[in-house]
Amino acid sequence: LESPPEEFPPEILPEPPAAAREPLLTLPAALTAYILLLAIIHLRVLLPPDLENWTIDVFGFIPKRYDSSLLAIGFPGGEGAKVWTFVTYSLLHANLSHIGFNVLWLLPFGSALARRFGAVRFFAFMAMTAAAGALAHLATHEHALAPMIGASASVSGTMAAAIRFAFVRGSFLSFSRGDADAAARVPAQPLWHALRDRRVLAFLAIWFGVNIVFGLGSIAIGAEGVSVAWQAHIGGFLAGLLLFSLFDPVPRAAADAADASS
């Protein structure tokens, strides 16, 4: 005869194994390295004032540096600064609130993009959007002497690129999202299809409205004080939105396959 199955009193029933909980926000290595780079570079504020100002003049983006009518004026950094400042300005910040604000916006969107692109593509993308922001600032401030600094053109680019896939079913702004890696690698919508998505359009309207009215992230430091370089944000944003596909390693979905419904 078989013995009846052993029964446990309710008070000594074995507890089921706890389900693994995914952290709300996990940072990929590429994004962590980028944020650490910003933090390390920001230690320049500990330098003597003259030397700190020199770093801004050499690595900040100064539109007047490209004014051909100023042949007799030499800017710090020489001819090389005409090249590297298209990117290096984005690694400089005025103070902790400036760098903290940019990092805060970078965390959700940059995290998804770094997982999707991988380290090399991610850093190349950040450099490209920084350069696009500098070009937009140069086009609208041709004779400005105030150096522009701040990562917000690149941050804006990550936000624009991320909305190409953020609302797709299973992605990180979808109600049916999977784990962080899977959410970052859903097929992106074709641009024309994304621009028909009401949520994408709402995001675009809010983003452009906030930037035009208030300005966020990048600043220009001059004798007249600090001003927001919102044109650089728009340059980085448009570059991220339009050039996303050049960096995206995930095969594109057909318009009917990339269903944006959550």
Model-predicted regions and their roles:
Residues 2-262:
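A detector for small-residue-rich transmembrane helices and their helix-helix packing motifs
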